[in-house]
Amino acid sequence: MRPNRIGVAVVATCLIATGCGGGGGAQDARSAASGSFGNLTGICRPGDASSASAPGVTADEIEVGTFSDIGFTRYRDFIDAAKVFTSWCNAAGGINGRTLVANIRDTNLTEVHQRMVESCREDFFLVGGGAALDGLGVKDRLSCLLPEFPAHVTTSENTGSDLQLSSGATVSEGVDPYSGFHDWLINDEHPGSANSIGVLVGDSPITEVMSEKVTESLTASGATVVYNEKYPPAGISDWTTYARALRAERVRGLIFLGEFRHLGRLQEALTDIGYQPDWIDANATSYNAEFLGAMRDSLENRNYYVDLSGIAPLDAAARVPAVRQLKDMFDQYAPSSDITFQVLRAFQAWVLFAKSAATCGDELTRACVYQAARKETAWTAGGLQAPVDLSRPLAEQTRCFNVQQATPEGWKAAEFGPNTGVFRCGFTPYRYTQDFGRPITLADVGRSISELE
């Protein structure tokens, strides 16, 4: 069965249906016509491509796979990002004249292997997606020499695996990318909370490892974890037991690793018993409008923070042209869709793919795109993120963090002391001492980088 295809049909539908909604008007038209994004010039543009140079590539099209658990989660973040970027890029002429087509690979949580087999058969590249159980498809991907620029990686088997370039932080790394954020939160913003930290996670093999990692990093930094508990991953009807446990342990700072809707139910229980930690790390997946709606009754006098880990926030649009342009693009191509943290992560992956592919001309190959991306030693996705050196492993680099706080007026930058634009950069992430697994390599499946064509 062919996947859902986003590309020519979307552009055609937009033209028929009065331009895909309102929004940026002339500015949108100019950005699409130029194919420039942020400070990157002409990443999408017309051309005279004539060859079928690689799997998934013809003289007219480039088929790219985007993984998503949408059949299970119903979250459209990666799909919306794919729709908006490909629509904008194709309106500018595509990739040297080739139409960019996003094949949505719905993994439905457990069907990663099946979708990867399909992607190996049909796609040129994987871009701007992710799956909770992504480790189930790594060996298939490497066996067919399929590179990826993911929006998000989850398991240790996949994080940093071969033929993968990811510039975003994830708890599945061998280092703690949130150690700078937590240091600021515990020692600077709320210094009285250091000896009373709680960790609450949704119960799954993945989040169990997350809990162990967070606890090790916090303990090494001098903080004391007084509460560490799991809750059923599907949530529960009554969160009073967890609220009372947090009160009994006098938790002053809570790190919540789970579904943001569940945090809303926990907050209701905390309010009912009259207890509230000084702060809650709601994790970056809560960076969306739905979270603000769920928490609207408690935003005035509660401290909910998230670390965007070097991804420029939406409230920086006046200072960061790439953010302003992204918002305009959504106004034009997906006016009813929310721009979430996962959308921002996906967009930087699409920009990386387009810029790298554009350098290859007519002879578009996987090797050319992958090697072009690896030459980016200060990658910012046109200004969407803090600089990252894609020629080196992410775990070997210093990091940036930037903190957003939920307020009645929306997500706003906290006073976290930025030193590089809208980011605070230069901290060295804590390296775990425990063995939490390693990424899969080409050698593990009997392949070599020299075989990439």
Predicted features along the sequence, with ranges:
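C-terminal motif of bacterial Sec signal peptides marking the signal peptidase cleavage site
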Residues: 16-19
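Bacterial signal peptide processing site
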Residues: 21-24
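Solvent-exposed, acidic/polar segments of extracytosolic/periplasmic ligand-binding ectodomains
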Residues: 31-55, 377-453
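Extracytoplasmic "Venus flytrap"
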Residues: 40-61, 65-83, 105-108, 202-209, ...
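Extracytoplasmic ligand/sensor domains, especially the bilobed periplasmic-binding protein
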Residues: 49, 123-230, 278-304
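Beta-alpha junction/loop-to-helix N-cap segments that form part of ligand/metal-binding clefts
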Residues: 74-83, 92-163, 231-239, 264
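Extracellular/periplasmic periplasmic-binding protein-like sensory domains
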Residues: 167-171, 270-347, 437-441, 445-450
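Extracellular/periplasmic ligand-binding modules, especially the Venus flytrap/periplasmic-binding
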Residues: 203, 211, 260-265, 311-376
